[in-house]
Amino acid sequence: MTSILTNVAAMAALQTLRGIDSNMEETQARVSSGLRVGTASDNAAYWSIATTMRSDNMALSAVQDALGLGAAKVDTAYAGMENAVEVVKEIRAKLVAATEDGVDKAKIQEEIEQLKQQLTSIATAASFSGENWLQADITTPVTKSVVGSFVRDSSGVVSVKTIDYVLDGNSVLFDTVGDAGILDKIYNVSQASVTLPVNVNGTTTEYTVAAYAVDELIAAGATFDGDSANVTGYTVPAGGIDYNGNFVKVEGTWVRAIDVAATGQEVVYDDGTTKWGVDTTVAGAPAINVVAPASIENIDITNAAQAANLDALIRGVDEALEDLISATSALGSISMRIGMQEEFVSKLTDSIDSGIGRLVDADMNEESTRLKALQTQQQLAIQSLSIANTNSENILQLFRQ
């Protein structure tokens, strides 16, 4: 049936054209944005996941920047610590040279002073962005943290993980408040010892005796030659501490005798100018620890007390050197870990970007082909609508003469 009121063909052609135009708009939007899922209305699930992961990627980008800053701090501290190791090696070499008879200790001390000033310069200069890990107030250990990663667990809870480094007496060169740093603290060092037979109340027992600053006791083959004495009600000052009890005589000096069960160190002689100690343990025990004459910061071999105890001073420097090497190793390990973490975060960011792309990116080849097809369909729909609109004109021809 042909009607002049209702053009069914034109209505159908127009509906088709509207659908094609709608599809073209969507396709053109995907082509222009490059996204298959650009809004939540396109695909709510994929849009939600992609938006969350983009947010996480922004956080990871901030982590990568923080890692770069942390790496700079660690590398600065590492460079300073590595240089300090070499300087302390030089100081130890100077002290070894000072043990030779006839050397000018004053000249050697001048060289040591320059090396000590270099250590101070290293500790002061090893600062980055206001952070100095080589000198600090370590009254209580201070933890320095470098942002390491941003983590979202299975329940959606996010957290920031850090790489920590503790500043304490084994990791800083100088303590800015006290004397607990590697270079400004005095070390306990292992000292030579000899075994002496000691007669206490009629019972002879062998003791391992470590002597400090007394040549007669630390010399090889030193022996005990004397009698025991039971002193009651008499106080003998020993390094500022008073004792009551048994005493024995060593090289003309009365020293306190310790019961076999006791193992503590005892300072036993102080005449006002020379101070030394005797430690006793059961025979066969390792050498006893004694206090070095000075810290590295306070080395002065022109001082009579230090010059007389160079061996202990060298051992103290050696202990400090071991701590320096350990601290340098720790910083090197952290630097390596930060480098690995930077590489990992970079790869992780790329992987997340790739995953987001798989969810929401448009296939441009496919979209281009679809757009071309829709453009063709649009032209055909317009042609169909044009033909449908000519039907009314055909009806008019029936009434023309």
Swiss-Prot record:
Q: Kindly give the Gene3D superfamilies that the UniProt entry links to this protein.
A: f41 fragment of flagellin, N-terminal domain (1.20.1330.10)
Is Secreted found in the keyword set? yes
Per UniProt, the keywords (alphabetical) are: Bacterial flagellum, Secreted
Q: Name one GO molecular function term.
A: structural molecule activity
Q: Name one Pfam family in it.
A: Flagellin_N
Localization (cell)? Secreted; Bacterial flagellum
- Give GO cellular component annotations, separated by semicolons: bacterial-type flagellum; extracellular region
Q: Which domain of life is it from?
A: Bacteria
InterPro entries assigned: Flagellin, Flagellin_C, Flagellin_N
Q: Does the keyword Magnesium apply?
A: no
Coiled-coil residues are: none
* UniProt main location, coarse: secreted
The record describes the protein's role as: Flagellin is the subunit protein which polymerizes to form the filaments of bacterial flagella.
Q: Which family does it belong to?
A: Belongs to the bacterial flagellin family.
Protein name as it appears in the record: Flagellin D
- Species of origin reads Rhizobium meliloti (strain 1021) (Ensifer meliloti)
Name the gene that codes for it. Answer: flaD
